[in-house]
Structure formats: C-alpha cells, structure tokens
C-alpha cells in the first residue's frame, strides 16, 4: 500500500463547496480540519458536511457553528473517507473564513 500525505486549503464562501474528494481506488483519512475566522471584527458561522457516495447522502457534521473573530475551530479526530467521498464547507459570508485540512491518502 502506498501512502501519501496531502494538504488542502481554501477561502470559504457563502455557498457550500467541495473542499476535498477522495480519488478513485483510494481511501482517505482526514487527520485534522482547521476552520479559521480571518477577520478582526466579524463573527462568522461555518458548516461542514461529508458526502458519502455509497449512500448518496450528505451528512452534516457541523451546522452554522459560531467562530469568533480571529479564532479557529479545529477537528482533531479522524474522518474516514472511501473513494469518491468528499468534504464540503461553507461560511455565513464571503471573505470571512478559510479552511485547511490534512489528509492521508491510502491506495
């Protein structure tokens, strides 16, 4: 089995967007997710979901969670993904938040 560590970061918008998708013929372990409010004076709300391709379903694991200005919300427990599964994120408004994740891809 070949393992590859990957990082992915994006600027969040008010539209749910796919941040990461597990490639075909691989499995992924999301080691950590960092959701950061990059403003100094605006509260932001963030949502995160996992799309399970085999179930044809999005599962919300975070829904409109408050992130104070200059703060970071961290998921530090693993999220296991099968081939084609994805992580989706959105914020309450554009230009308020960034998201970063650390992934181990296993083939």
What are the functions of these language-model segments?
Residues 53-86:
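Intrinsically disordered, low-complexity Pro/Gly/Ser/Thr-rich segments with frequent PxxP/GP/PP motifs
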Residues 29-34, 47, 72-74:
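Ordered hydrophobic segments in well-structured contexts
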Residues 1-28, 32, 90-107:
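C-terminal interaction-tip segments
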Residues 51-55, 106-107:
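Short edge-strand/loop segments of extracellular domains
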Residues 35-41, 92:
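Short solvent-exposed strand-capping/beta-turn motif centered on an Asx-Ser/Thr pair
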Residues 47-51, 100-102:
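Beta-strand signatures of extracellular beta-sandwich domains
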Residues 27-29, 41-45, 57, 96-97:
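Short acidic/proline- and small/hydrophobic-mixed sequence motifs that coincide with surface turns
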Residues 46-48, 87-89:
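Hydrophobic beta-strand residues in large extracellular and virion-surface proteins
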């Amino acid at each position: 089995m070949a393992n590859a560590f990957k990082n992915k970061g994006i600027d969040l918008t008010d539209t749910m967007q796919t941040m990461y998708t597990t490639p075909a013929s691989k499995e992924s372990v999301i080691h950590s997710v960092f959701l950061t409010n990059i403003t100094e004076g605006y509260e932001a709300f963030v949502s995160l979901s996992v799309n399970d391709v085999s179930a044809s379903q999005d599962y919300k694991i975070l829904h409109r969670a408050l992130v104070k200005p200059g703060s970071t919300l961290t998921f530090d427990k693993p999220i296991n993904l099968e081939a084609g599964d994805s992580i989706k994120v959105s914020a309450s408004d554009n230009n308020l938040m960034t998201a970063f994740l650390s992934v181990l891809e296993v083939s």
